Amino acid sequence: MTKQLVPPQIPQEFLPRHIALVMDGNGRWATNRGLKRTEGHKRGEAVLLDMVDACIAMGIPYLSAYAFSTENWRRSTDEVRFLMGFNRDVLRRQRDALNAKGVRVRWVGRRPRLWRSVIRELEAAEELTKDNTTMTLAMCVNYGGRAEIVDAAREIARRSAVGTLRPEEITEDSFTQFLDEPDMPDVDLFLRPSGEKRTSNFLLWQSAYAEMVYQNKLFPDYTPEDLFAAVEEYALRDRRFGGTK
């Protein structure tokens, strides 16, 4: 990001604390231009960094980016291989820059099937940035919302079976502590470019009362101004959380 960002003037109390971002449309963007699908993913790297800068400019403390889902293993072997290497290399290339900006990187997702080299880079980024406080970037790699809930339920069942957790102790708050990143707040703004209107199994528990904003623009074409527009729309929403005002 080289140009000066001019975020909208929105009072802090009307800003989302946590944005969930589905980085959708990379493959279609490339196909529309007669390029390999991998070229769309490469372009998406720069766009994600722009989104981090935009969040910092607005004072939004949490951004969760859907980088690779548990369902993405169904893609072609070549594309999966590329995405594994690409996620590894993005972290390797960008962790120092993210650290310099005060960004704390967190990994959300499952270990099974994930390349060891990807895990090493995720853990290295977490360790390098663990004390940063400007904002938190959750890289959701090998992540699925249902898988996360199932994993949490299994751990609760295991503890109940050995007598360390009583049924009456299982509440929404205590259940949250068994999720992949329990210290992050619930999602306020669920953002999906590309024109598609679905959650795609992303942060299901955390997005129970998220405001959904769908924008008809493929992710490689997405700009900070598009993110600003989504936040402005969010700020105008009347969030009642099931109640009335």
From Swiss-Prot:
Co-factor binding comment: Binds 2 magnesium ions per subunit.
Keyword Magnesium: yes
Pfam families in UniProt: Prenyltransf (PF01255)
Cofactor(s) this protein requires: Mg(2+)
Superkingdom: Bacteria
MF annotations from Gene Ontology: ditrans,polycis-undecaprenyl-diphosphate synthase [(2E,6E)-farnesyl-diphosphate specific] activity; magnesium ion binding; manganese ion binding; Z-farnesyl diphosphate synthase activity
Active site: D24, N72 (proton acceptor)
Sorted UniProt keywords: Magnesium, Metal-binding, Transferase
Record: residues binding Mg(2+): D24, E211
GO cellular component, one term: cytosol
Annotated residues for binding of substrate: 25-29, 37, 41, 69-71, 73, 75, 192, 198-200
The EC number(s) this enzyme carries: 2.5.1.-
Keyword Transferase: yes
SUPFAM superfamilies: Undecaprenyl diphosphate synthase (SSF64005)
GO terms (BP aspect): polyprenol biosynthetic process
Subunit (UniProt): Homodimer.
Entries under HAMAP family matching the protein: ISPT
Free-text function comment from the UniProt entry: Catalyzes the condensation of isopentenyl diphosphate (IPP) with allylic pyrophosphates generating different type of terpenoids.
UniProt similarity note: Belongs to the UPP synthase family.
This protein's name: Isoprenyl transferase 2
Organism, scientific name: Corynebacterium diphtheriae (strain ATCC 700971 / NCTC 13129 / Biotype gravis)
